[in-house]
Structure formats: structure tokens, C-alpha cells
Amino acid sequence: MAVAAACRGPRIVRTHGDFHPFNILFDEQDELALLDASRGCKGAAADDLTALAINYVFFALPRRATWRTAFAPLWKAFWESYRLARGAEELERDLGMAPPFMAWRALVVANPAWYPDVTLETRDAMLTLAERALDADGLDLDEVEELFA
């Protein structure tokens, strides 16, 4: 399995642990601040990457037309920016480790205890994403498109 092989790699990073848009702030000078890093520790970059990236999918699902015009370009730009910053090899390694983290994040946002106003259709799509992630050897960035087909 790609996840097991990737875990043997040399790259362990400091993680935030709850990296999502509502924990990222910018001030008037565009300085970045991260909130709520209490669950941060050392781990896989794939954890924080999927925690942030899943929001492009999650916020597009209730208004599916926004995927093609807004969120898909942002999704692609996010991953491309990471590739440019870290290199293709690290991106591939992190995508190989991403499935369990993506599945976990999908389960979190599908959970009515944390997101009670999410529609059944959105919950179902997030659960589908979780199942597909767990069935995969790595995160296929293009597979997300199927949720909007």
C-alpha cells in the first residue's frame, strides 16, 4: 500500500492538527496568523494538506455550479502551488499518504454533530469521498471531479 511505503519516508513535519479556513487569519498588512494549533505535533504533511484542501470540495457541494467556475480552479491552484513550493517528489509522497487523512476530514465535515445544517446530499457526497479515498493507494486529484458530474 502506498500509505505504508510513504510512512517510511524521511519527511516528518510539524503539523497544525486543525488546519482549515476558519483558523487562518490575515491582518491589514497581509501577515498570516494561525489559530487553534493545540492539536499540532509532528506528523505527515498530508494531514494538514487534506484538512485545508477538503474545504474546496465541501463549500462547492451545496452550490455545485461553483465547482467549475470557482472551487475547481482554487483546488488545482492549491495543489500546484504546493508542488512548486515543495517539488513534485514531495507532492507525490504526500498524495500517497493522503487517503486516510482525506477520509477522516470527509467524515468530520459529514458529521451532523459538527455541521448540523449540511444537507443529506452533501453528507452523502462527503461519505462517498471518504470511501473512495480509503479504496485508493493515493489521492487522485482529478477524481474529485466525479462528485460534481
Spell out what each predicted region is:
Residues 2, 76, 80, 128-131, ...:
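Surface-exposed alpha-helical segments enriched in charged/polar residues
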Residues 46-87, 102-119:
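Active-site activation/catalytic loop segments of kinase-like enzymes and analogous catalytic loops
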Residues 111-149:
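Regulatory N- and C-terminal appendages and interdomain linkers associated
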Residues 1-16:
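An alpha-helical support segment within catalytic cores of ATP-dependent transferases
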